[in-house]
């Protein structure tokens, strides 16, 4: 497996691997080392008593021929055996096992991906560093703490990205935990070095000087800190003369740039607000248009006597949710079929029309065909019956499992006019509609949001949502731009069916209006 961080499902395998290493391999190695040490200790204790007696009366001791013989034997043979025992490497078995297992361990990319996921969650859900570090997240079953070293590492990631605001937050958290007495390999001098520079870059000169002074108290010979201190004093003197800080001017420029960037990316703010549940609140008048009902698939014979529960989630675009539409047994079957095939989820490259991985889609997916399992075939039939659309031209059922902070940033499911080759290889036209199963509950986060209209749809196991991506005319509905929010706590499994235009000519015909 690769890209472990993109799938919680695959990361569970790592827990079992680690347990096996600890229980059978590492403990066996410890026992072997303890046994070896015990033999050496017994030898030392025996010789301690013997030499203590012998040195009190060497001639009398050696006057006994057996003692003389045993001395010769010990020095010639037994000390050599002890040397061999000391030199015996008990780690061979453990090391060989480790070498085999490490082939399947996460790599640097996985560690970086997990680090970035934590930072992404912090931004999206407005979490302060103390909340993340103390593990005080909603719905957690197993609380976990970040060490000062962990906080320092996260701060360094932000530093390399020139994000000095978050660098300051994480370095301060690391320093706080060390000041509270946490024992760590993290060094206060290193932390203060990064922290003072991050604070200076944001224009707070007096705080930068205070932190640098504290650093110099710990390490008076620190070259960079001494140089920085002189520079800060020079800048401070210039401030007093001009009564205006050039640093403040730089800070103001940074702030203006930041505001421009934020204004330039309004969708990002909408997306994050929706993920936090701060979305658009429907007016009572609009809410009255939303209903729940028993739905029989337009008099479909399979559902006339046993209609399904359907709820309106949104009016424009129309998003409906089907409740109790997939059983726990079906979910487990789909997951078991998909797990061995899960690979890093891809997106369509608009320039090449080919599939490629992307940093904004953090999940793993697998494709299941109807002929592989009666369960998948039954699910496909159910989708066809309830949507009234032909699934023979649809894509295979895609199963996705999200990773650490797993997400899929805002995107369209359909190919736009400037992407004429998006689904050319399939030969079935554009994606007319999307059917999305939620196959797990998520403790926190993981909503499906529509930034253009302000809709948030929250995961609920056993339900499915459905919407049309195209108008009856075949034009794309740009209000269906949507995203999967980062998973804050939990393990998110979904499966989706993309239905295509071909085969729907008489099932969803064009209307008389060009605008629809």
From Swiss-Prot:
InterPro entries from the UniProt entry: Oxoglu/Fe-dep_dioxygenase_dom (IPR005123), P4HA-like (IPR045054), Pro_4_hyd_alph (IPR006620), Pro_4_hyd_alph_FE2OG_OXY (IPR044862), Pro_4_hyd_alph_N (IPR013547), TPR-like_helical_dom_sf (IPR011990), TPR_rpt (IPR019734)
Record's keyword annotation contains Iron: yes
Predominant localisation class: endoplasmic reticulum
Residues that hold 2-oxoglutarate according to the record: 492
Residue span(s) of domain Fe2OG dioxygenase: 393-501
UniProtKB keywords: Dioxygenase, Endoplasmic reticulum, Glycoprotein, Iron, Metal-binding, Oxidoreductase, TPR repeat, Vitamin C
The keyword Coiled coil appears for this protein: no
Protein name (record): Prolyl 4-hydroxylase subunit alpha-1
Lineage start: Eukaryota, Metazoa, Chordata, Craniata, Vertebrata
């Amino acid at each position: 497996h690769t890209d472990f961080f993109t799938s919680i499902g695959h990361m569970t395998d790592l827990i079992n691997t680690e347990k096996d290493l600890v229980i059978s391999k590492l403990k066996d190695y410890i026992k072997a080392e303890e046994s070896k040490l015990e033999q050496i200790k017994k030898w030392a204790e025996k010789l301690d008593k013997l030499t203590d007696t012998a040195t009190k009366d060497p001639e009398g001791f050696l006057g006994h021929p057996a003692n003389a013989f045993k001395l010769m034997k010990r020095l010639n043979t037994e000390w050599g055996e002890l040397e061999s025992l000391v030199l015996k490497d008990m780690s061979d078995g453990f090391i060989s096992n480790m070498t085999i297992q490490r082939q399947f361990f996460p790599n640097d990319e996985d560690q970086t991906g997990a680090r970035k996921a934590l930072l992404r969650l912090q931004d999206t859900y407005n979490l302060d560093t103390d909340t993340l570090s103390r593990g005080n997240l909603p719905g957690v079953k197993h609380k976990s703490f970040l060490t000062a070293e962990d906080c320092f590492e996260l701060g360094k990631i932000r530093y390399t990205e020139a994000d000095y605001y978050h660098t300051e937050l994480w370095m301060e958290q690391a320093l706080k935990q060390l000041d509270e007495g946490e024992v760590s390999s993290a060094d206060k001098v290193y932390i203060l070095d990064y922290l003072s520079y991050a604070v200076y870059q944001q224009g707070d000169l007096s705080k930068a000087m205070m932190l640098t002074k504290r650093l110099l108290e710990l390490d008076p010979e620190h070259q960079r800190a001494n140089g920085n201190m002189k520079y800060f004093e020079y800048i401070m003197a210039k401030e007093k003369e001009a009564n205006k800080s050039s640093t403040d001017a730089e800070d103001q420029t940074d702030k203006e740039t930041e505001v421009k960037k934020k204004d330039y990316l309004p969708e990002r703010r909408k997306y994050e607000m929706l993920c936090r549940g701060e979305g658009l609140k429907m007016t009572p008048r609009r809410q009255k248009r939303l209903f729940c009902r028993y739905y029989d698939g337009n008099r479909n014979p399979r559902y006339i006597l046993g209609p399904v529960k359907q709820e309106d989630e949104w009016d424009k675009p129309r998003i409906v949710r089907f409740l109790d539409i997939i059983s726990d047994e079906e979910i487990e079957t789909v997951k078991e079929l998909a797990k061995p095939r899960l690979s890093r989820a891809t997106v369509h490259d608009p320039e090449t029309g080919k599939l490629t991985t992307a940093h904004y889609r953090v999940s793993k997916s697998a494709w299941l065909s109807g002929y592989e399992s009666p369960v998948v075939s039954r699910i496909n039939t159910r989708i066809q019956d309830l949507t009234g659309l032909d699934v023979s031209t649809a894509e295979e059922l895609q199963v996705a499992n999200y990773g650490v902070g797993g997400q899929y940033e805002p995107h369209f499911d359909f190919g736009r006019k400037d992407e004429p080759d998006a689904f050319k290889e399939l030969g079935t036209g554009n994606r007319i509609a999307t059917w999305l199963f939620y196959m797990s509950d998520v403790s926190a986060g993981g909503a499906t949001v529509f930034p253009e209209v302000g809709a948030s749809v929250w995961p609920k196991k056993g339900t499915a949502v459905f919407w049309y991506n195209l108008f009856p005319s075949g034009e794309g509905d740009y209000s269906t731009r949507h995203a999967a929010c980062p998973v804050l706590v939990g393990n998110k499994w979904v499966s989706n069916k993309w239905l295509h235009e071909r085969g729907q000519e008489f099932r969803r015909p064009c209307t008389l209006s060009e605008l629809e």
